[in-house]
Amino acid sequence: MPALNHIIVPAKDKDVSAQFLADILGVKAQPQWGPFRPVQTSNGVTLDFVDSKDVRTQHYAFLVDDAEFDASFARVKDAGLAYFAGPHKEGPGEINHHWGGRGVYFEDPNGHLLELITKPYGELPPG
């Protein structure tokens, strides 16, 4: 089965954007590679930030375990970022509990919508 390897993420400033995501996720931004500044996730997929004058915002969701959610969500709050329970800014200052897990939405410096979830949406809880 094919696996996703990388995603190109347009950014106003690739270094600022890569470092922002790395800081929130508690990982290290990778060294620049060509025109890209990658951030690697635990499953090996990289988000390759590239400078762009035209940033069309997208949505990126990260599946994390409960401990990672707690740590990343604490960093979101410590950074003073606005966060929401829903993708259209529903439930300001709240998280959601979809599918028996926890989820939260917030924006990166480019306006990309980032999401942390502890359960994949559509996966029914046991029992």
Model-derived features: where do they sit?
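Short aromatic/hydrophobic contact patches that present stacked aromatics
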Residues: 6-8, 38, 59-61, 103-105
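N-terminal beta-strand motif that seeds the catalytic metal site of vicinal oxygen chelate
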Residues: 1-15, 60, 120-127
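Short glycine-enriched loop/turn motifs at secondary-structure junctions
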Residues: 1-3, 53-57, 97-98
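Residue-level detector of conserved, well-ordered beta-strand and adjacent loop positions
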Residues: 40, 50, 107, 117-118
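Hydrophobic pocket/interface hotspot
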Residues: 17, 21, 60, 76
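Core segments of cupin and vicinal oxygen chelate
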Residues: 2, 8-47, 51-53
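Vicinal oxygen chelate
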Residues: 62-109, 113, 120-125
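Short, charged/polar surface micro-motifs in flexible loops or helix N-caps
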Residues: 44-46, 54-56, 65-70
